[in-house]
Amino acid sequence: MLAKYSSTRDMLDADGDTTMSLHSQASATSQRPELGHTEHQRPSSAWRPVALILLTLCLVLLIGLAALGLVFFQFYQLSNTQQDSILQKEEKLGNLSRQLQSLRTQNRKLAETLHHVAEKLCRELYNKTGEHRCSPCPEKWKWHGDKCYQFYKESKSWQGCEYFCIAENSTMLKINTQEVLEFAMPQSYSEFFYSYWTGLSRNSSGKAWLWMDGTPYSSELFDVMIDLTSLRSRDCVTILNGKAFSKDCRELRRCACEKAAAMVKVQSLHEPLSRRWR
């Protein structure tokens, strides 16, 4: 009986072991998926902080881009405003420049008109008295047209008169227009036969007559009476009693000089004569 019990216990033990072994296997089998699920969930929980950080960085980047866009927009508006302001200022400057140019033109025209009126008035006063404080010429010089003339009593050679006129800041007389001819020839009348050198000369009898500035002589204005009694290397022209004569340049004759007249100034019409020649 003991042997039967022992065999039965052994069988129970064997069955128990078998049962326990099966239970253990079942338990182990049922627990494996839980372990796998746990291992599968661990990486997800580890990426959460990283994802949060990346999301935060993205938000910061978006905010930065938005701020940068706002700054760029403000700068763009400011640039457009400044550009409009510059264009407006340039337009105003252009208008002012045109107005200034117009005023300068008007001022120049007024100055020219004033000069013509003053010159006309001064010339009328000068023609009445022969000399007036408004005259644009130096003292004792004759005003005619736009030139001042002086007929000196000193007698010199032609070259001597050239140097004399240069010393007076002038040149020798030049008769190149009918108006000057009608003015200069009456000045040459003299009861003592004093003639005046002009700036007309030529190197030899075959050469053309030239004025000192190189312009040619016009025979349509006046004729030059040639002296054929002697041969000379250089001929110079004098005027006497309304006629022109060819003479030896070394002869002594009076000097006739001319210079450009100064502009008639309005204030000179009100200055005393004695004050003008100080």
Curated annotation (Swiss-Prot):
Glycosylation positions in this chain: N95, N169
Domain of life: Eukaryota
SUPFAM superfamilies in alphabetical order: C-type lectin-like
Primary location group: membrane
Stretches of the chain forming a coiled coil according to its record: none
Region (Disordered): 1-42
GO cellular component labels: plasma membrane
Residue spans crossing the bilayer: 53-73
Membrane topology term: Single-pass type II membrane protein
Span of domain C-type lectin: 144-258
Pfam families found in the cross-reference section: Lectin_C (PF00059)
Entry protein name: C-type lectin domain family 1 member A
Organism of origin: Bos taurus
Origin organism lineage: Eukaryota, Metazoa, Chordata, Craniata, Vertebrata
Gene: CLEC1A
